[in-house]
């Protein structure tokens, strides 16, 4: 089962079945003939922007929308303490323990400006596609992390 088909089925189940949590979603996927590990399902949910929210019918998994994206962007931005650059790379400083999440947030945009990221505990090293793009990359990161 390829990722695209699996994620499409996840979207369908969430929209049609009123799924309350990942455990229920995992069960529904297996009943549909899709075998997936819990860790893979968690990654799929993160990539699809799926959130668990309280509704009139109790807690439900919901597909993220534009407003959810803005909320997440704001939360990720609050974890960033500074963005700095030299001639070859950009450094994003975060609150302790939050660099991985910030690095993953940057990775999900799949920007051609970013060759790669490496996250430690409180620092993300962002490698640009070209040293000529450092200032453009800085602006891009600041825009996507809501930093000043």
UniProtKB/Swiss-Prot annotation:
Q: Which InterPro entries match?
A: Arg_repress (IPR001669), Arg_repress_C (IPR020899), Arg_repress_C_sf (IPR036251), Arg_repress_DNA-bd (IPR020900), WH-like_DNA-bd_sf (IPR036388), WH_DNA-bd_sf (IPR036390)
Q: Where in the cell is it found?
A: Cytoplasm
GO molecular-function terms, A-Z: arginine binding; DNA binding; DNA-binding transcription factor activity
Instruction: Using the UniProt record, give the first listed, main subcellular location.
Output: cytoplasm
Single Gene Ontology BP annotation: regulation of arginine biosynthetic process
| KW Isomerase (keyword) present | no
Keywords (A to Z) from UniProt: Amino-acid biosynthesis, Arginine biosynthesis, Cytoplasm, DNA-binding, Repressor, Transcription, Transcription regulation
Superkingdom of the source species:
Bacteria
A Gene Ontology cellular component where this protein is annotated is: cytoplasm
Similarity comment: family membership: Belongs to the ArgR family.
Which protein is depicted? Arginine repressor
Give the species this sequence originates from. Chlorobium luteolum (strain DSM 273 / BCRC 81028 / 2530) (Pelodictyon luteolum)
This chain is encoded by the gene named argR
């Amino acid at each position: 089962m390829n990722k695209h088909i699996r994620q499409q089925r996840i979207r369908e189940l969430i929209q049609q079945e009123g799924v309350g949590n990942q455990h229920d979603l995992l069960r529904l996927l297996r009943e549909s003939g899709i075998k997936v590990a819990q860790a893979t399902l968690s990654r799929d949910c993160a990539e699809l922007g799926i959130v668990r929210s309280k509704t009139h019918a109790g807690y439900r998994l919901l597909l993220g929308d534009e407003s959810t994206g803005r909320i997440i962007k704001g939360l990720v931005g609050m974890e960033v303490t500074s963005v700095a650059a030299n001639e070859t790379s950009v450094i994003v400083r975060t609150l302790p323990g939050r660099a991985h999440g910030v690095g993953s947030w940057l990775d999900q945009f799949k920007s051609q400006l970013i060759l790669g990221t490496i996250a430690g505990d409180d620092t993300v090293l962002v490698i640009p596609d070209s040293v000529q793009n450092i200032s453009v990359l800085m602006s891009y990161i600041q825009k996507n992390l809501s930093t000043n």
